[in-house]
Each structure stands twice: as C-alpha cells, then as structure tokens.
Amino acid sequence: MSEQITEEMVAVKVTEESCSTCAICYSVCPYEAIKKDAETGKAILEIEKCQVCGLCYSACPSKVIDIIYYDLDSLTGYLDRAKQKYDSDTLVIMCKGSAPDLAGIERQFGVTKFIPLSVPCVGRITVEVFLKAITTGIKKIHVLACDEDYCRYQRGSPVEGRRIAALNILLEQLGYGTEAITLKRNSLKVQVKEDLCIGCGNCVFYCPWDAPRLVSPGIVKIDMDACHGCGLCVSMCPAFALDLENWEKDRISMLISQFAAEMAPPRILVFCCQWAVFPALEDEPDKHTRYIYLPCAARVDTSHIVEAFHTGVDGVLVAACAEDDCKLEKAGGKAQRPVEALQKRLGEIGRGEQLNFCTVAPRYPEAFKRELAQFSEKIADIYVRESA
C-alpha cells in the first residue's frame, strides 16, 4: 500500500484564474515571492520565498490573494468584540516591531482608553479594515508603524504610510476631518546601564549592525541610528548592563513567574520569535502552555530559561525563524548555539529533553503546531514518569 502524501497547508494563496494581471502584487512584494507567468501574465506565488508580510494581500485590487492571518474577516470580527471588551471607540493599530507597552502607547498618542490591535506589519492593513472600523463606530484610529528604515518587511511601513495619506484625503472629503487616521513611527532600541558595563566587548562582537562600540575607559556606547532592536547584545551581555525596551530582563522574569503560576502541570513555556509564529487575535490559552513573544529569537536569554525551570516550568521550547528567514540579519540564528549548550548541560543532570530549539515559519501554519504537539507529548511522558 502506497504512503498517502498530504499537502502542507500554506498561509498565502493566489487564485490564479481570477488574477487580472495588474502586476501590483509582485511590484510590492519585498521578497520576489510573486512572479508573473510568462504565458498568461498572471501572478504565481513561490511559497518558499514568502515571508507572510501581507503586502500583496492588502494591495491586490482583485482580491484574489487569500491569507489566513489577520485577514479582513478576522480583523473586523475582532473589532466588533473588542469595542465591548475595551469599552472604547479609539483604535490603536501597532506593528509588533514598533509597539512599546501600553503606557508607551498612552505617551505616543495621549490616549488612556483604546482598543489595541497588534499585527506583524501594518502594511497588511487594508483600506477596507479602516473603513469598516469607521463605519462601525470607531471615532479615532491611531497607527504606530516602524520607522521606515527599520521595517522588518522592508516596504510595509512606507507603503502603509502612503496608503493612510491617500485615505485621509478621501475621508476629509467625506467629512471625517483632516486627520481621521493618525500615523506615528517608533523603533524600540537597546538601553545601556553604564554603571554595570564591564567593557567585555561581547555586544560589539555579536551585533549584526555594528551599533555598539567600546569607548574609554571601556564603556559601551550604542549608535541608536544603527540599532535594530534584535536584542542579541542583551542576551549576550554577562553583566546585565543592556536591556531592550518592552523586552527588559525584569519584565520577562515577571512574565515567567506569572505564567508558571497560571499553568497546570505539566507546564510548558514557549519563547517565540514574533516573526516565526503568528498568534491568533484572541486565542484561548491552553492550561498547560504559555508564550513569551520576543522581537527575535536572539533575545532568548539562557538565564531566563533556567529561571523558568526554577519556577516550576516542566519544559521550555524556543521557536525561531530559520536563518534565511530572519528579519534581523540572521541574528536569530545566533540564539541556537547558547540554547543547545544549555541543553547539553541539562543533559548531564538528566534534563536535556526538557529544553528544545526549533525553527518554523508562518508560511506553514501547521509546522509550529506539530513541533509544540511533539514536545508537549514528550514533556507529558516525563511528567507522568517522574510523578509515578
């Protein structure tokens, strides 16, 4: 009997027979993942190149591109529920790479009560989403995008800026005022505690952008224009002299303690690169699993992994992008070695199986689910065995 081969589910699909051959999708794609068929002129998607930024989806005038993450139906459904949950008519749309904590949002836009909507890239937000929000009672929309030069998807931030500018002109003509949609930009940067710096140079060695430099008398200075906020230098600093806005060491420690207390055993904590795993807008948390989403797998600190085990977590899974998919100059690939080194040390005391590192991509939505299911099964077996 021949083995049945099942096709891998993909996150983005193009209905080629309905394509109008307008060429907009492959003009905006930052990764050359969409090609023009030489004979028909229709769009063809090369899924292995696709990074699921959503730019093609938001730009297609014929609506022949489908995306399973944060599409029009899921976003508008979320807004309908969120208006009641947050009791607000102000919407704040944030790129995951630019968004500070909620207090930071308040400082940016001067709002204290709002509906938060965090997406991998604001470039995927279509005109229809803005119009649907306005026509269903949203009075004010704020958009927080990455600085144009720091967009993880290269073109998402500048494209959305132009889209919002054009839409504001239309909305003004329809009587919604001169700036119905407010756009601001933000990039999260590393922070230096000079009194703790020991001048070891680790940050200088590891940074993909040459942002840190040592100055006399051995104190690190950061070129903030060069810093892309991957967090690799923070994870590699032995003196805890560096921190990253919104992903500070103490904040992550607080989340670890909170999640360990919330979960039922066997407890699994997942450190995710937020570009490798896209969460659903309103996932009901599994009682055994919690997630800490990071700006890059490079921000995974082995001290946090040890801390998780110390607080009662039974298994830790690190989910990263493959090096070729990394949005931060392959910084995430440098996270694997320290995690595997810790795994080896844990193996010496019989705990190596309780830590795992995997690479996944949102283009294949089921891939992470499989990794988590396999790891969860292993941790459950260990828990049962040790509880016997």
Q: Which residue stretches match the model-derived regions?
A:
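Primarily the internal scaffold of c-type cytochrome electron-transfer domains
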Residues: 69, 73-85, 92, 246, ...
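Short alpha-helical segments and helix-capping/turn motifs at coil-helix boundaries
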Residues: 77-79, 126-129, 256, 301-303
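Short secondary-structure transition/capping segments
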Residues: 40, 80, 153-157, 257, ...
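Ferredoxin-type iron-sulfur electron-transfer modules and their immediate structural context
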Residues: 1-35, 87-131, 135-216, 266-297, ...
